Amino acid sequence: GAMEVQTARTGGISVVDDLQAPSHGQLEQPRLDFSVRVSGQLAAHIDATCQALWQKLQARAGRKSQSLALRGIQSKSDTLRGLGRKPKQAALVLRDNLSQRRSIERSYLRAIARAKQEVLVANAYFFPSRKLLAALCHAAGRGVQVQLLLQGRYEYFLQAHASRAFYARLLQAGVAIYEYEASFLHAKVAVIDADGRSPWATVGSSNLDPLSLLLAREANVVSRQREFAQELQNRLQAALAQGRQVQAADLAQRPWHERLFDRLAYALARSMVWLVKDHF
């Protein structure tokens, strides 16, 4: 019979060596990234998702005589056995170009809307939708401490400059922005109200950018386990300490050509989003 899967992992960790950057060579410190190991039925659910996708790709490649349709595998609440002794609720949240185009974005929006104390997001590639941007600003406006840990090293033109086009509005709304400079940031994680009544945390493959939210196949694990949320929060706070906080004065003092690049990158990214939305 088929082997029963005991554990599974999901996260943002790349197959590339964490001490190597394709465009920068050897790194002094490894990339900052996260993955989560799950067990039980949630691991089996992840396995079923991978098996179904593998069958679909085999069929598409013509390796089977009949086409195998990928069954819609929905997000499922289950248990995540990790840092705490007792199993707690967790879910696998998927994004594809079929029935689950907005699932990860909706998960973030619901959690941010319910935030009472703190929202802490670490994202390598940050170009939020208008709804996500508004949700972050509204949360800060109602007194929630909103902190973003973003890429502090120059990696790609579009990513580096398009993200900074959002800084002024976020800072004006009261959002704290930190740029991680110890190494390259590759994390796609968030923690909300880790010490509150309804903790929420996610670790996965999805950035808050158009590629992840509109095009790519992504998978995040969402957990409401307090111990898990607090441990992730502690690790992110340590990473914030290695970052540089961006001040409004910093934006005004940037060279004119850098600000021009921000506007150009933003306009290019927005046009790409428009094309993608029109296509899908």
What spans do the regions from the language model cover?
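Charged, low-complexity intrinsically disordered terminal segments
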Residues: G1-F280
